[in-house]
Amino acid sequence: MVNKKFVIVIAIAAVAISFGVAAFASLVNRPPEASIGGGNPSSSVLLVHGLGEDASMWKKWEELLTNDGIQYHTITFQESDDKCGTALAHAVELGKRIDEILRSNPSGQVNIVGHSKGGIDARVYLANGTQSVANLIMIGTPNNGTPMAERTSLCAPAVWDTLPEANATKVGMNPNTRYYTIAGDWAKEVGGNPIIPGPDDGLVPVSSAESEGNFQSLGRTEHAHLELLSEEEYNLAQDVLLGRR
């Protein structure tokens, strides 16, 4: 009989490899930024990808947002071809993208949904005191860093912003924005990733994603880090995105 712990360790290795390989993938046919839907711009959603990824990771959410009649926008960071730019550089790009979105409605606001480091990028943007973002939902974001970042130099300098005690994880909160989290609690039956203390999604500790005392948790799913953009996570975020919370 195959040892479950061995299977989980192998799976963790595969996730970690994917985490790094993604940083060098999709350099051709970069997905264009999109603005879709007929909703009010004051309640539209900006979808922000994580390190080494691009806007194509949001396909499922695009479908679900459309079904709910919510206008959405995407961004693929341009600061570096491999999408491995710093949180500060990405924050500048976010500011420009949000300005574009709100140009037709200067008094409106957007909601940001960020996966992984995309949540840190959004936090750094929000630290400038802007009033343009009503809600930030962070999915699997290493808000207090992750020990996995200490084991790789792939996707630098982006990965440095996910180190424990990284300056980007310490930025202040914007009083004009409500902050929410969704975390993955993966492989609970064997205790998750043995490298990470406590429950985790294979890459990010739940304690870091939720950063208890700072943000409001919308809940947890049992998905691994790269699987956290399913309908289950969307359902946890839905009330916020529809203005019911």
Where are these regions (language model features)?
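N-terminal Sec-pathway targeting helices
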Residues: 1-16, 23
